């Protein structure tokens, strides 16, 4: 299927690893010009190298900035005033006992997980509406609808993304611009693979065996009973970024392997 993304400019925030990197790779494979973002120049350049190793003709641009700050968002807006596709993928998470999370951590999660998307969307969405063309996608989590007690601050920001995305979609009424949210389930990113390698230190388990045990013990409601691969998320996001998805707007879309036991 030709997704008609050749020549489209896509900004993928937090795209030097995990789901963000996979999305950048998938968009590049479809011919989009992709802006790679991260806080560290060496990681951004390594990502570009990795994508070019698979897609030598990919058109890639560098955007080194900390988008968890207003200054970082300003830098990216200045470097790329107009984009056709904005993937608000940047996000931080870490387990923490609710009673031990100080105000500063709540504000840090809010700045990174929410305000990065707010600041960029505030700039790019108006231009998209004026041009009557564009895609904005927020990468949330199944935690948005199934909050985690050990990550209350993270879960709260993911739920907020659903409301934010729907509010912004309302602004696109009558245009060819869409705003949606994708909610991945547990995904085998680099960080999760590292966790699996250390989760059962006293047992000689392969990564595959550790994955199966983790899913059985910690994600028993998953229908597929395995971790989702970043590429599976990325390919769906790429479709959602394309003109082919024009009838999907204001939606919160789960890619969780059936983890959330709900028909809605």
Regions found by a protein language model. Name each.
Residues 121, 157, 165:
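Active-site helix of classical SDR
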Residues 126, 170-171, 246:
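Alpha-helical segment proximal to the catalytic Tyr-Lys
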Residues 173, 178, 248-250:
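Short, small/polar-rich loop/turn modules that mediate ligand/substrate recognition or access, typified
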Residues 9, 16-17:
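Conserved glycine-rich cofactor-binding loop
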Residues 97-98, 105-110, 218:
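Substrate-binding pocket helix/loop in short-chain dehydrogenase/reductase
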Residues 141:
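Residue(s) in the substrate-gating loop at a strand-loop-helix junction
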Residues 146, 237-238, 249-264:
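Short C-terminal tail/terminal secondary-structure segment
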């Amino acid at each position: 299927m030709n997704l008609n993304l050749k020549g489209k400019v896509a900004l993928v925030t937090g795209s030097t690893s995990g789901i963000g990197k996979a999305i950048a790779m998938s968009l590049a494979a479809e011919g989009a010009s992709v802006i790679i973002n991260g806080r560290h120049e060496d990681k951004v350049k390594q990502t570009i190298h990795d994508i070019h190793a698979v897609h030598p003709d990919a058109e890639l641009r560098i955007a080194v900035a900390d988008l968890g700050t207003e200054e970082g968002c300003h830098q990216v807006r200045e470097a790329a005033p107009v984009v056709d596709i904005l993937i608000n993928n940047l996000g931080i998470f870490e387990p923490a006992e609710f009673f031990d999370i100080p105000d500063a951590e709540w504000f840090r999660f809010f700045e990174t997980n929410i305000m990065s998307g707010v600041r960029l969307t505030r700039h790019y969405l108006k231009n998209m509406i004026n041009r009557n063309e564009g895609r904005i996608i927020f990468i949330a989590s199944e935690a948005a609808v199934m909050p985690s007690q050990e990550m209350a601050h993270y879960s709260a920001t993911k739920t907020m993304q659903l409301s934010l995305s729907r509010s912004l979609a309302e602004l696109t009424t009558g245009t060819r611009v869409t705003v949606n949210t994708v909610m991945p389930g547990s995904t085998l990113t680099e960080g999760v693979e590292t966790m699996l390698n250390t989760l059962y230190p006293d047992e000689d388990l392969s990564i595959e065996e550790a994955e199966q045990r983790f899913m059985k013990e910690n994600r028993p409601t998953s229908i597929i009973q395995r971790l989702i691969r970043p590429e599976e998320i990325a390919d769906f996001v790429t479709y959602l970024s394309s003109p082919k998805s024009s009838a999907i707007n204001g939606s919160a879309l789960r890619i969780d392997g059936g983890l959330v036991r709900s028909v809605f």
